[in-house]
């Protein structure tokens, strides 16, 4: 093989790696993670391992009801879909929306629509809906001034992304920052010590952990479900 062909082969490999990397951008208050994915699923019972080269990004999705020693679908907040199969969770009043993914589309919607229509999809989960079609949804007064590091699954400029606040903020401020960043859809993702652990893969295939200290939190072992982006 000539030097020119070797260089071309290396360049092609690098382009493929770049195409599968999680892209990161930032604003003053937010960090945006854009996974380049081929599919999405809801992992249940056990978080995908960092040794799995097919996983691009993985983080907690729906709320978990109780701190149980073993996994049960009834401990996941509201009905959910994994691998194209529907499962029944516990009814959670705080959940107002749902996210669904099917190979030819994704959609953010109100929970009542999701539960009544049962749309055909490969994966789905319910959570607290923050923004729908460019408009902020009604905010629970009791949550307005809750302070934490927030994370949401969002749609911006026609792309899916995971968005985090850079520091502890109120929910009201977090949503304000999302709106100012022209996020068109956003649904909350479970956070808090233990629940906020996540990881993603870069262009070299190397794993980067988010909140790695949470693996030492007491609640870490009780997590139940993860929105997972696959290469």
Per-region residue spans from a language model:
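Short glycine-rich loop/turn motifs
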Residues: 95-96, 147-152, 223-224
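Active-site-adjacent helix-turn-beta-strand microarchitecture at beta-sheet edges
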Residues: 68-138
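Conserved, well-ordered active-site substructure
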Residues: 71-85, 155, 160-168, 172-181, ...
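Catalytic metal-binding/acid-base residues of hydrolase active sites
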Residues: 63-64, 192-194
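Bacterial N-terminal signal peptides that target proteins for export
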Residues: 1-7
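Hydrophobic h-region of N-terminal signal peptides that target proteins for export
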Residues: 12-19
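Zymogen propeptides
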Residues: 19-91, 163-164
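Conserved beta-alpha junction segments in alpha/beta enzyme cores
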Residues: 129-157
């Amino acid at each position: 093989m000539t030097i020119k062909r070797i260089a071309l082969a290396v360049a092609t490999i690098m382009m493929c790696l770049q195409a599968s990397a999680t892209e990161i951008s930032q604003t003053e208050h937010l960090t945006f993670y854009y996974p380049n994915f081929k599919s999405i699923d809801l992992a249940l019972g056990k978080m995908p391992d960092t040794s799995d080269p097919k996983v691009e990004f993985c983080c907690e999705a729906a709320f978990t009801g109780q701190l149980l020693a073993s996994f049960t679908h009834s401990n996941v907040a509201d009905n959910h879909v994994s691998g194209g199969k529907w499962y029944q969770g516990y009814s959670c009043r705080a959940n107002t929306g749902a996210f669904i993914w099917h190979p030819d589309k994704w959609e953010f919607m109100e929970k009542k629509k999701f539960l009544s229509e049962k749309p055909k999809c490969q994966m789905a989960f319910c959570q607290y809906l923050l923004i729908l079609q460019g408009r902020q949804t009604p905010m629970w007064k009791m949550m307005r001034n809750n302070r934490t590091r927030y994370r949401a699954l969002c749609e911006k400029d026609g792309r899916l992304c995971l968005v985090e606040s850079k520091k502890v903020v109120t929910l009201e401020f977090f949503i304000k920052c999302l709106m100012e960043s022209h996020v068109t859809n956003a649904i909350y993702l479970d956070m808090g010590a233990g629940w906020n652990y996540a990881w993603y893969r870069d262009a070299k295939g190397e794993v980067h952990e988010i909140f790695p200290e949470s693996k030492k939190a007491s609640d870490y072992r009780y997590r139940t479900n993860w929105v997972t982006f696959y290469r």
